[in-house]
Amino acid sequence: PKPSSAASDVYKRQLTTQRVYTEAELRSRYEIMLENYCKTVCIEAQTMSDMARKQILPAVAHYAADVARDASGKQALDPDIRCGYEAKLVKKLTAVAESIDTRVDALDGAIARFKTLSDVTEGANFIRDEMLSRMTELRVAADEAETLTAESAWPFPTYGDLLFSVK
């Protein structure tokens, strides 16, 4: 991110002409804001990774195991009982868990690469070009997992709870 648009040039010229800030002060403020942005997004990415690894993946795996046990229990009672729904659900849950795991690995890799960057502008560009897309990919997979997992097994309030249970 570089403050090079026509509007930012106008603001920069106005602020320096009016002697509100010097050119060096504007650059310093810009770098401080970029650094704050980078730190904030990095904290969000690390939190997202931790939530997926420590809460979402275990919840999905546990729920898939419960569904598989339920299907096995039904078939133990009567071998003629078809458990197509349960089998399909377990396959979907397993696939989405694998997807989440892969995306967490990709996000962790992006976080590690970000931490090697020393220039704040390079870091902000990396966040824009790499880290945010990894976070979005993980979010999409986690949202899919939420739709497949029973509400009682999901470790967080659902969107419905957040939107409609305001008291």
Segments from the language model and where they lie:
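Alpha-helical rod/repeat scaffolding segments in eukaryotic adaptors/tethers
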Residues: 38-49, 53, 70-97, 110-132, ...
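Long, contiguous hydrophobic alpha-helical segments, chiefly transmembrane helices and signal peptides
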Residues: 8, 15, 26, 30, ...
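Acidic, low-complexity proline/glycine-rich segments
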Residues: 12-32, 160-165
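Preference for long, well-ordered alpha-helical segments
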Residues: 137, 144-145, 153-166
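Single conserved hydrophobic/aromatic residue that forms the stacking wall/gate
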Residues: 1-7, 11
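Charged, amphipathic alpha-helical oligomerization/scaffolding segments
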Residues: 32, 51, 55-62, 66, ...
